[in-house]
Amino acid sequence: MVRQAIIFLRVNSYNKNVKDIRNIIVDNKVDLVISNTVNVFQGALAAAFEHVKHFWLIHEFPEGEFGYYKEKLDFIDTFSDEIFAVTGALTEDLEKCFPNRKIYSFAPYTQIEPKEGVKTESNNQHRIVSVGRLTQRKNQLELIKAFQMLDLAGTELVFLGAWDEDYKQLCDDYIEEQDLKNVSFLGYLDDPWSEITDKDLAVFPSSMETFGLVYVESVLNGIPTILSDNAGHKSAFEYMNEQGHIYPLGDLDALTRMISEVLDGFDQEKLEAVQAVPSLKERYSLESVYANITEKIEDDELRHKKVTQKDIDFLNSRKALTKSVKSAMKKLFQLKKMN
């Protein structure tokens, strides 16, 4: 009974969300609703009720914690005038999921202000730096192992970002077991890029990304950069004119070799990284990354949405609420049985 009550409360909360969005659409004469993640559906329903356009922007691969949305593809298809996915591997994946419609691409955008100059308090010593939260998915332990294999006298390995406690402990244990020196964790910083020196090499060994915004920030700041070849990183690497170097995820020999080569030729690497910034800034402009979206915003036709008035009438009914609760209860019982 407690679970049933929780489900009813959740469904009622969703209904309130949809109603609130509908009121916003009406009060503000909204012509287009954009859902900026696959993980929400309320905007899609509100747009259908009010007969306005709805775009779905999908940043997530249909796997892992987001694998559930493979079962929701029909809903996404029905309630979207246009579907957009992060350029590269995700777009290719979703084209297979939606074979009967065009999936448009975009690049995730974040406001980046490249530094006019970088700190120079490096006493002419190179550092290997990695920006981002310390997590299993970010896979920083791979970089720590590579650093151990390199055994570079005087070179520091610096991590800039907060951390998940369990994963930080895993890294600390490895550092202690191997008696590694010159590894530091600076924690969260409002502006980690301000800590970068003109002698630093950035390395991002993440095991999974949708696009790789931290890589984008790195090359836009003119930093020599190495990144792993997970699907999201490859998409960003291709989008940013293949600036930097990419290595096979999990291949420690390849990573150590690449770090060594970049450090050996660092002056030329730095020069090329800085020279690439103007063209990369132009490529990664707001107008460029969202070009497909703005083009479709200007299109007055509702091209793909398949929802009918009959669907809307049903969703407005108490029967729909009952069906939603029954579906949720069924899933709970299935999970209980599995456990």
Predicted segments, located by residue:
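Donor nucleotide-sugar binding/catalytic pocket of nucleotide-sugar-dependent glycosyltransferases
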Residues: 78-115
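A conserved mid-protein helix/loop that constitutes part of the nucleotide-sugar donor-binding site
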Residues: 126, 133-149
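Glycosyltransferase donor-sugar binding loop
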Residues: 131, 156-169, 185
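Aromatic "clamp/platform" in nucleotide-sugar-dependent glycosyltransferases that forms part
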Residues: 188, 207
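Short glycine/serine-rich donor-binding loops of glycosyltransferases
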Residues: 212-215, 233
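Short hydrophobic beta-strand element within catalytic cores of glycosyltransferases
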Residues: 224-228
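Conserved acidic donor-binding segment of nucleotide-sugar-dependent glycosyltransferases
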Residues: 241-253, 260-267
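A charged, aromatic-enriched C-terminal amphipathic alpha-helix characteristic of glycosyltransferases
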Residues: 267-323
